[in-house]
């Protein structure tokens, strides 16, 4: 006789057809990974045979399939009516006596005398969680169910949920035969995360598909709020190779608003067993996980990924009573892990518009169309093909119409919620967690939704033009020098790392300071003495971090380490901050500390600033961050570049200052490069090279200073050309000096990106690397290869 109920510890991946993907996976982890440190709560599962016999013995099979055969799933109203009818039939039917009895016996064994045991009752479909089909969230989950009668009712609710509107539509669209899909109910001991935290993690970056990170989201209370997208969670990125090396490996921390949490309700039966409450303001301003917990979760994720041999989508929970971290689900990631690695598809806006709303970007595409604000699932049928669907949050029930939309925008949700997962699967751009999109965007208004700018997604006014470029990158032609990239935005690092490249020739700190920090370092050093209004602004920025100075250093560490990890083990040359005084003044508190200069471009910047008494303590914070990235995290692919070194005296002083702050040339393989961007640098190249390990040519400033041009002046802008003979003479001098000394020589200015013929000339001069803007890498690479063939 076939069993109707099986203990989870008796199951493994080979049991998908008996208990569905979810329950088979839980059994696999309990059986094989407990010894490796993966904690999974115990429980039992009903079998697919139990489900089939229930439908057969109750006479439901023929009625259900007759109703489905007559249904057009694209008719949203008919779908809702048929789905509701079938679910009602299932709930009204009685379980076979043997199934009822076996559930009672299994629950008694699990409870072991604890009459008040709380369990989760989850669905597990036999076609769910297969490597090439994501049924994420299509069937129901019931949390905090107590008492065996409530468990049996919840199991029946789970069976009925196979006929949710979204599940019916999804099976039709994916070509799954309704008759071949069966359901198993998993009953699992609850992790007490209502007093702890919970969330989702992926063993790759969900947007770019970058494989060397674990991406973790978390919020307070039960994990359903994160999965549903009802809350904007905290986010963390952990670098796998660094973690495997036993070093601190957290690359990024993004503080989410975490406004609500789901906790146990007053009743213990399906539908009333949980409730949502507000989170205290103080808890919102803290990260829901400690660094140690983030690291522990990442380790468990890597163990699971290694066991399954593929990228995984994992749900986790922290028990508020015992403080332990548990894995409550694991399934194969089904979108990015199947994407082609040999064809790069890039979306590029042709024009910029007014930004109306912004949030978290899902995918890397662009969509445009008229806004359709949907406040309730009953309004779903209003969405027409090409509309931009705007809502507070999307429920998986909305899936039947989501595929009609050109883009999706929500007030709430993070990158691992259902809306995000489904949008990725459908290839539709989505911006989630916008906060107020439903108030700002108006029905019928034309907008453009762009997820092609990095972590932040933008909704622009008007339907803007955009291009889609596809390039094959599986076999790039050889060149006699390295093509590197100029990258400033850590949000784009994992994405840009997918392009053919030899590393980063210019990583700018300015973007990190501007976007991720936004506060003048002096204001953080002098926090106690700040005026009240500035202090309040700073306090909002530093939420989640222990102190103002620690915030500055850690944010620099996060930005630099993300860039270094994305391209590891390739070289990443990080340029020390090169803000001018007017740019520093624009940071919070900046006007208190910056001089007013007539021409900041030629003023207090670069090495002069670092060695000055007024800025040296700020510069030392940059040194602390770089030292942590290289020496503690072990990301020794980071090299340092010093900009705007006017004299040999400055060169000597700045190298000495770096060494005094633990960044000594040659120590732990450290190379210190000088940005060759003043005529004095090229004219005295041999002398400057005594202090540095090479040059990176900054062609923008070198051209400006050689030709006596203000590059910000429109009047003389037409004379600005890096190919001017005087500029090329200085370039040739710098290249020859570095080659003679056997030291690094590259170029990171705008010139080669704008003028591929200049890149070809540099190649002929014997330059070691050309660092380009990411959007010109492929075109320039192919142009140079063709020129080489013709030569």
Swiss-Prot record:
Its EC number is 2.7.9.2. GO terms for biological process: gluconeogenesis. The keyword Transmembrane helix does not apply. It comes from the Bacteria. Mg(2+) binds at residues 677, 701. The modification Phosphotyrosine is found at residue 744. Pfam families: PEP-utilizers, PEP-utilizers_C, PPDK_N. GO terms for molecular function: ATP binding; metal ion binding; pyruvate, water dikinase activity. Transmembrane segments: none annotated. It catalyses: pyruvate + ATP + H2O = phosphoenolpyruvate + AMP + phosphate + 2 H(+). Disulfide bonds: none annotated. The active site is at residues 418, 748. The keyword Nucleotide-binding applies. Its cofactor is Mg(2+). Substrate binds at residues 508, 575, 677, 698-701. Keywords: ATP-binding, Kinase, Magnesium, Metal-binding, Nucleotide-binding, Phosphoprotein, Pyruvate, Transferase. It is an enzyme of class 2 (transferase). PANTHER family: PHOSPHOENOLPYRUVATE SYNTHASE (PTHR43030:SF1). The reaction takes place in three steps, mediated by a phosphocarrier histidine residue located on the surface of the central domain. The two first partial reactions are catalyzed at an active site located on the N-terminal domain, and the third partial reaction is catalyzed at an active site located on the C-terminal domain. For catalytic turnover, the central domain swivels from the concave surface of the N-terminal domain to that of the C-terminal domain. Catalyzes the phosphorylation of pyruvate to phosphoenolpyruvate. This is Phosphoenolpyruvate synthase. The lineage of its organism: Bacteria, Pseudomonadati, Pseudomonadota, Gammaproteobacteria, Pseudomonadales.
